[in-house]
Amino acid sequence: MSEQTPAEAGAAGAREDACRDYQSSLEDLTFNSKPHINMLTILAEENLPFAKEIVSLIEAQTAKAPSSEKLPVMYLMDSIVKNVGREYLTAFTKNLVATFICVFEKVDENTRKSLFKLRSTWDEIFPLKKLYALDVRVNSLDPAWPIKPLPPNVNTSSIHVNPKFLNKSPEEPSTPGTVVSSPSISTPPIVPDIQKNLTQEQLIRQQLLAKQKQLLELQQKKLELELEQAKAQLAVSLSVQQETSNLGPGSAPSKLHVSQIPPMAVKAPHQVPVQSEKSRPGPSLQIQDLKGTNRDPRLNRISQHSHGKDQSHRKEFLMNTLNQSDTKTSKTIPSEKLNSSKQEKSKSGEKITKKELDQLDSKSKSKSKSPSPLKNKLSHTKDLKNQESESMRLSDMNKRDPRLKKHLQDKTDGKDDDVKEKRKTAEKKDKDEHMKSSEHRLAGSRNKIINGIVQKQDTITEESEKQGTKPGRSSTRKRSRSRSPKSRSPIIHSPKRRDRRSPKRRQRSMSPTSTPKAGKIRQSGAKQSHMEEFTPPSREDRNAKRSTKQDIRDPRRMKKTEEERPQETTNQHSTKSGTEPKENVENWQSSKSAKRWKSGWEENKSLQQVDEHSKPPHLRHRESWSSTKGILSPRAPKQQQHRLSVDANLQIPKELTLASKRELLQKTSERLASGEITQDDFLVVVHQIRQLFQYQEGVREEQRSPFNDRFPLKRPRYEDSDKPFVDSPASRFAGLDTNQRLTALAEDRPLFDGPSRPSVARDGPTKMIFEGPNKLSPRIDGPPTPASLRFDGSPGQMGGGGPLRFEGPQGQLGGGCPLRFEGPPGPVGTPLRFEGPIGQAGGGGFRFEGSPGLRFEGSPGGLRFEGPGGQPVGGLRFEGHRGQPVGGLRFEGPHGQPVGGLRFDNPRGQPVGGLRFEGGHGPSGAAIRFDGPHGQPGGGIRFEGPLLQQGVGMRFEGPHGQSVAGLRFEGQHNQLGGNLRFEGPHGQPGVGIRFEGPLVQQGGGMRFEGPSVPGGGLRIEGPLGQGGPRFEGCHALRFDGQPGQPSLLPRFDGLHGQPGPRFERTPGQPGPQRFDGPPGQQVQPRFDGVPQRFDGPQHQQASRFDIPLGLQGTRFDNHPSQRLESVSFNQTGPYNDPPGNAFNAPSQGLQFQRHEQIFDSPQGPNFNGPHGPGNQSFSNPLNRASGHYFDEKNLQSSQFGNFGNIPAPMTVGNIQASQQVLSGVAQPVAFGQGQQFLPVHPQNPGFVQNPSGALPKAYPDNHLSQVDVNELFSKLLKTGILKLSQTDSATTQVSEVTAQPPPEEEEDQNEDQDVPDLTNFTVEELKQRYDSVINRLYTGIQCYSCGMRFTTSQTDVYADHLDWHYRQNRTEKDVSRKVTHRRWYYSLTDWIEFEEIADLEERAKSQFFEKVHEEVVLKTQEAAKEKEFQSVPAGPAGAVESCEICQEQFEQYWDEEEEEWHLKNAIRVDGKIYHPSCYEDYQNTSSFDCTPSPSKTPVENPLNIMLNIVKNELQEPCDSPKVKEERIDTPPACTEESIATPSEIKTENDTVESV
C-alpha cells in the first residue's frame, strides 16, 4: 500500500486539478454558448478517467444553477453523452431522471420546450426504460408531457405476464361504459398480479414500473374527475372559444387525456403479450388504433412538428380515424377534440403513449367486445351528445365562474385532493399549451369535425376558421381574447397570415404569456373568467409580450397592440361608458368583457362608434399609420367630407398659387395698418387666405403623406368643430393614429375659429402661425374651444424655414387638434414638433419632435419620446386615465396627490386638471386643455389657470429628471397661477419643450420652453405677468416678430400685462425670427436664445404683445384658440391685481386693455412677463380693469390659437396689431387703441376690434365654406396685395423679403461667425456652453442616413454625401467579394480631413488608378502608333536596306502577325526607308526652308555629295581644295537659310501674338 500511496496521491492530485479546472469552466457556462459547451465536452473527454467526478460536478451545477442557467448545463450533459459517451453515458444515466426533473420543475415554459426537444433526441442514447421513467415522472409534473411507450419487445422481455391476467385484461378494457374508470379500477389489482408472476430477474425492472404505475394510478383518478370536466368543457369550448382561466377546467380535460393515456399505458405492458398471442390478428386493429391515436391532438402536434403536415391534412386523417376508431377511442377522441386544443398542448408527449395504449385497449376491446367500431362510435356519439347537453349547462356556469364549474365537478367526484392536483397540473398544462398553440389550433379545426358535437363551437370556430382554418387561428384567437376584444377584431385579419405559417412558427407565435391553455381558451369561451382572474397588469404584460412577438409576425397585430396600449390607458376611463356598446358589438365575449379590462381598442371602438357615428375605429388609422398600409382612417372620409364643401373643380389662379401666404398676409396687414382696408375686410381676407392655403396645404400633404389622416394639415383646416375630436386627424400629435388626436372639446371648432386664425400675424411673413381653432386642442381651457394651437414656425416654415411649427389640429375637428410644434422645416430640422392632439382621448399623445430627430410622441396613453433614431427615448409616457398613474409618470398636484396621468391638481389638491393628460372623456376632453380655474374637465394636458393651479408647480419632466423626456413641465410652485413650466431637459436638444412659466408670473404664465438645446426649439414661456406661454424655441424661432414682418404674432408676449404667450426663440436658433417688430418696421430679428423680447421699436407698445399685466391671465387668453385658462379667462374683470398677484384674478380673463392700458411706452410692453413676477415689472399698472378683456372662454381658444388666431385684432392685433399695434403702438394689439377687445366667443374666434364694441363677425362657422377664390383673388388684386408679385412685391415683398430672409442669412452668418474654434480641444473651452455650436448642430438639411447636417448652401455637398453613403453601402455589400483593408491607426489629420462626402483614400486611389490607366492607355496608343511606323516589310532576302539619311542598316525581325520579315524602327516614305527619328529631323530642317525646292533635295542629296566628293578626292587628290571650298560653301548656305528662317519664324510668331 505504501508503494501505491504516491501513485494514489498523484492520481488524487490530478483528479483534484481536473475537477477544479472543470468546475471553474463549468461555472462560466451561464448561457447557451456552443463554443463553451464544445470546450467543456472536449475537456470532459480528456478527463475521461475522472468521468464520475465530472458527472457529479455537472449534476451539482445543474442543481445549484439559477433557473435561467440550467438549460446550458443540460446541453452540456447532452453534448458529452452524445460525443463522448462511454463512462459518461453510464454515469449520467444513473441520475438522469432526477437531474432532468430538477431542471424541469424550475424552468419556464420556453425552457421546457427546449427540454422536450432535448429529450426527443435521447431515444437512441439512453436506455428506453430510463427514458420511459423520465417521461412518466415529468408527466406527473406536467400532464402535457407525452410518455413515449416502451416498445413491445422491451416489455415482453422484461415482464412475464400471468395468463390469468391476460384473461382478465381483455375483459377489463372491454367494459364499455367506464372507459377511463374501469382501467383505473383494474390497474391496481393488476400490479400485484404482475409482481407475483414476475421472476426475480425482473423485480428490479418491475419496481421501476411499479413507481410509474403509481403515478399513472394517481393520474387515472384525476381522469375520472376530468371526464366530467371534459364533458362540461365540451359545451363551453364549443359555445365560447375564449380564454380559459389558468385553473381552468380546460386544463383538467387535458389531464383527462393524459391520465387516460397513463392507465392505458399501465395496461399496455400487460396486454402486450396478449397482443402477441391473441391479437396477432390485431394489425388491422392496430392500424385503426394508430389512426385513432392520430386523432389525439398531441399526436397531431407531433406530426406537425415532424412532418409539418398542414391542418387540413390532419383533419382528413382524423376523420378517417374517427370512422375507424373503436368505441372507446371514439369516446376519448370526442372528448379530446373538445379539449383537443388543450390536450394538444398538454399532451404532446402523451400522444405516443396514447397511441399504444389506445391500440392495446382497442385490440383487447375489439376482441372481447363488440367487433364493430362503428356501433361503438354511434353509441359514443350519443354519449357525446349527452355530454354536450351537460357541457352546455356547465358552460353557463363556467362562463360565470370557471372555478365554480370546477368545484362542482370536483364535488361530484368528491376528490378535493385530486382537484388540487388537477389545478396544479392544469396550470402546468397551461404553460405547455402556450408552447403547443399549434396543437390547439388543430383542435379548433377538429372540433368541427366531430359529428355534431362541435356545432356550438362552430360559430366560434367558424369565425376563427374564417380567419384561417389553420392551427394558428385558435392561438390567435386566444391571444386576442386574452388581450381583450380590441385585438380580437384585428386578429380576425391577422390569423390567416399566421396560420399559413409553419406549425412551429405558430407555436412560437403563441407567446408563453398568452393566457394559460390557449387552446382551451379557444375552445371554451366560458373560461374567459380566467382572464378575469388575471390581474389587469398581468394581462397587459402578457399582451405586451404577445404583441411584441406578434408584431414580428403580423404587422397588423403590431399596430393593434401598439394602439391598444396607448388607448388602453386613455380609454380606461372611457371604457366605462363605452364598455357596454362594445360588448354588444362584440357580444361573443361574455358579459364579463365589461368587467374585464377593455383594451383601448375596444373602448376606442365604442367611443368612435358613438362619437364618430360608426366611423371606422381609429385603430384602423393607427394600423394604417403604423403598418404604413393604406387603410383609410376614418379621417380620410372626414377629410373628404369637409373637402366636399370646397369645389371639387376649384381652380386657383396662378397668382394665388404662386403667392406665399406669408406675403399675402403681410401685405394685407400692411394695408390694414395703412387704413386701406377695414378691420372687417382684413379679417375676411385673412380668413379666406388662410382657408385657401390650408386647402392647398391639405392637398399637398395628402399627396405627400402616406397617412393623410394623421397630419392635421391634411384635413381641411376647417372642420366642423362639432365632430368628435376623435375624428380630427391632427392627432398626429400622438403619432398614433388619429385616435390620439387631441380632441378638442366636443366642439371641433373650425380650425380657424374666428378671425384669429386668419390673423395675418400667424400667416404673416413669419408664417409663424400660432393658430389653432379656438377650440382646438391646445385648448387652453376654453371649454368650448379646444383651440388647437398651430404655431407655424417662421414664415420660412411653411414657406420658409421657420423652425417652429406649432400647429394645432386646426383642421382637426373637435379639438382633435394636435399641437404640432414643428421646428424649422428645413435645416433646422424642425427642432420641435409638438404635434398631435395632446390630450386626445383617442390618442392623445404628444409628439414632440426635436430637430435632432427627437420625436416626442405620446400615444394617447402616454407621451412617447422617441430619440432621433426613432427609438423611444423616453421615459415619459403619459397614459392612463387621470386616476391612473399611467405610464408611471404621474404628475401630481402640489399636494402630491396623483392627479392622474398627468394631472396637475391645484395646490388645493383639487384635481383641477393642472396638467391633465388624459383622453377626454368625450371627444372634447381630448385636447390639451389648459383649463383655467374653471377646471373644466378636458382631457389632455390641461393647463389650468394659475388660480386653480396655483402653486402647483408642475414639472412635467420626463421620467423624472430624465432629460429625455424633455418635457419639463414645471409650474411656478408659488405662483398662484401655478405657472407651468414645461421644459424639456435643458441639455436635451430634441425635446425641447420647456413649458415653464416665469416663477412670478401671475396667471401662471406658461413658459413653454424647449430645452435650451437647440433641439428644443421651442420655448413657450409666458412672462409671469404674461400668462401667455412664451414660446421660446430654444434654438428655434423666437417668435418675436421678424424685423420686417409684421411680427406675425410678434412675440407673443401678451401685452405686458397680458399673459399672452410670448414666443421667443432661443438665441441660438438661427432660424427663428422674432416677430417682435412692428410689422412695418423691421425689427431686427432677434434671435435670442433667451426670450429676449424683441420689442419692436420701443414706441410700439403693442409690438410686443405683452399684454399689460392686468391682462395677465395667461396670455393665452388672448388667443381664443388656445386658451390658457390660467387666468380664468372667463372673468372679464380687468386684472387689477398688482403685479405681484399671480393672476389671482383669473377672473379677468385676458383683458385686453385698451391700448392705452397697454403700455404705451414701448418699455411697458417690453416687459417680458418672465422677469420676476414680471407682472410687477410691468410699468403699466396691472389694473387693466378698463380694457375689455376677452372673455376667457371666448379667448380660450384664442389664447393660443390666437397667436395665430388671435382674432384679427388679437392676432391681427398681434400680428396685425403687431402691424397695427406695432404701427399704432397705442393700439392694443390690433385693437383700436381706444377700442376694447371684446371677448371673443368661441364662435368668434377672433377678437374683433370694434370701435363700437360690437364684435366683428367672426369667421363664419362654416369654416369649410367654399373658399371663394375668385372673390379673394379680386379683393387681393383690388387692394393691390396680389400685385405684390409685380408691383407691391417690389416694395412690400422686396422690403419684407429683404427684411426677413436677409436677417436670417445674417443670422446664419452671424452664427457661423459666432461658432468658436474648438479644435485646440482645451478642456476649459469645451466645458463652456456655446449656443451657436449647438444651434449649428441642429440647423441645415439633415442626412436621413447619418444625421449630418448641411447648410442650405451645401446642397451640392449634400448630394455628394448621399453618393458617398451609396458607395459605402455598396462596399459593405461587396466586402464578401473582395478583400478590403484599412489602416490600423488613423491619425488626427485623417479624422479631420475625413468628410462623409468622399473617402479621401478612395478618392486618392481612384485618381491614382485613373492616372495610371491614362498613362497606360497613352503608352499603348503610342506603342501602337510606333508599331505602325516602326515596322516596314523588308525587301527581298539578302538585300541590304539602310536609312536613306544616316545610312545605318535596319535590323530585321519576324512579324508573326503578318508572318513576314520587317525592318525594325523604319518607315517608308516615297519608296525610301528612313529611321523615324532621321526622317523627323529631316522634316524639321526642311520646314525651315523658306522655299524648299523639292527637286533640290534629291539632286543635292548629301550622301550622294559625300560619295561624289570621296570619289573625286580619290581620283583627283589635287582637287581637294575645291572640295574643301565646296564644303565651306555649303555651310554658309545653310547658315543663311537658318538665319532667314528664324526671322521668318519670328515674323510668324509676331503675327500670331498680334492677332
From Swiss-Prot:
The modification N-acetylserine is found at residue 2. Residues 174-186, 1162-1175 have a biased composition (Low complexity). Its main location: nucleus. Residues 1303-1315 have a biased composition (Acidic residues). One of its GO terms (biological process) is termination of RNA polymerase II transcription. It is found in: Nucleus. Keywords: Acetylation, Coiled coil, Isopeptide bond, Methylation, mRNA processing, Nucleus, Phosphoprotein, Ubl conjugation. This is Pre-mRNA cleavage complex 2 protein Pcf11. The gene is PCF11.
